Amino acid sequence: MGHWNRIKIAKCQILITNFLVLLLGLSMATMVVVIHFGDHFTVIGHASLERNPYETLRYWAFYVGISLAGLLSLGAALSTIATVREAHGLMAAGFLCFALSFCILVQVAFWRFYNPTQVEDAVLDTYDFVYDQAMKSPSSNWWQELAVIQDTFLCCGKKSPFGLLVSTGAIMCQGREAMREDCLQSIRNVLWTHYSIASILTCTSLALTVYAMMLCAFLWFAIHSYHGLDRKGRYSLTPPRSHGFQTQEPSLFRWT
C-alpha cells in the first residue's frame, strides 16, 4: 500500500472518528445537563443543610462534564477542518484539544476507581440527615423536604437491616405509600443507572480520544512534510524556448 493510499485511509478514518466524537460530546453534555437539572438530583442538592456535601460534587461534575464535552467537540471540529483544508496548524490545535480531553478523562477514571462510592455516600448522607431531622420534628420544614424527596424517588422511609421499616418511618408509610420501595435502595438504583451510562461514555471517550490523537499526529506529520498530499500552488504557461533549430512545446510547471 502506497503512502498516498495510507493518507487517504487516515483521512477517512479521522472524519468518521470525529463524527463519533461529536455525537459522544453531545451525549455527554446531555447527560451532564440531565444530572445537574434533573429532579432526582436537584431535590437532594437543595436540601437545607449548612454544608451539603453532594451540592459541591454536583457542581464539580457539571463543570467538568461541560468542559470535557466542549473540548471533544472543539477537537473534532478543528481536526475535521484541518483534514479538509490540509492545515497543519489546525491539526495541531485539534490534537491539543484531544490531549486535554484525554488528561481529564484519565483523572475522572482514576477518581471513579479510587472513590467508587463518594457520590453515593454523599447522597445517602444527605437523605439520612433530612430523614432524621424530619423524624425529630414532624411539624418543621424538614418533613416537607423529606416528602418532596420521597415523592421524587417514588419511595418511602428506610428499612432496617432486617428488612423492616423503622418505627418512626412506619408512620409516614401507610396506605399506597407503604407499597413504595425503600428510599435507600431506590436512590442506589437511580445512581447505579447514571453510573452505568457515565462509565460507558468515559470508556468510549478514552478509546476514541486515543485513536483521534494517533490520526491527528500522523496527518500532521504528513501535511507538515508535504509527503503524499497535494501541494497547493498555481500553474503558469511558459513561453516556447528555442534550442538551436529545435523548438520546445509549451510546458506547465508548478510553483508554490
UniProtKB/Swiss-Prot annotation:
Location of the protein in the cell: Membrane
GO biological process terms on file: blood coagulation; cytoskeleton organization; defense response to protozoan; hemostasis; integrin-mediated signaling pathway; negative regulation of myeloid dendritic cell activation; negative regulation of T cell proliferation; platelet aggregation
Tissue-specific expression: Expressed exclusively in hematopoietic tissues. Expression detected in spleen, thymus, bone marrow and peripheral blood leukocytes but not in heart, brain, lung, liver, kidney or testis.
GO cellular component assignments: cell surface; integrin alphaIIb-beta3 complex
Topology in the lipid bilayer: Multi-pass membrane protein
Superkingdom of origin organism: Eukaryota
Pfam families in the record: Tetraspanin
Gene3D superfamilies the UniProt entry points to: Tetraspanin (1.10.1450.10)
CDD domains membership: PHEMX_like_LEL
UniProt key word S-adenosyl-L-methionine: no
KW Transmembrane helix (keyword) present: yes
Transmembrane segments: 15-35, 61-81, 90-110, 203-223
Keywords: Membrane, Transmembrane, Transmembrane helix
Family label: Belongs to the tetraspanin (TM4SF) family.
Protein's name according to its UniProt entry: Tetraspanin-32
The organism of origin for this protein: Mus musculus (Mouse)
UniProt lineage: Eukaryota, Metazoa, Chordata, Craniata, Vertebrata
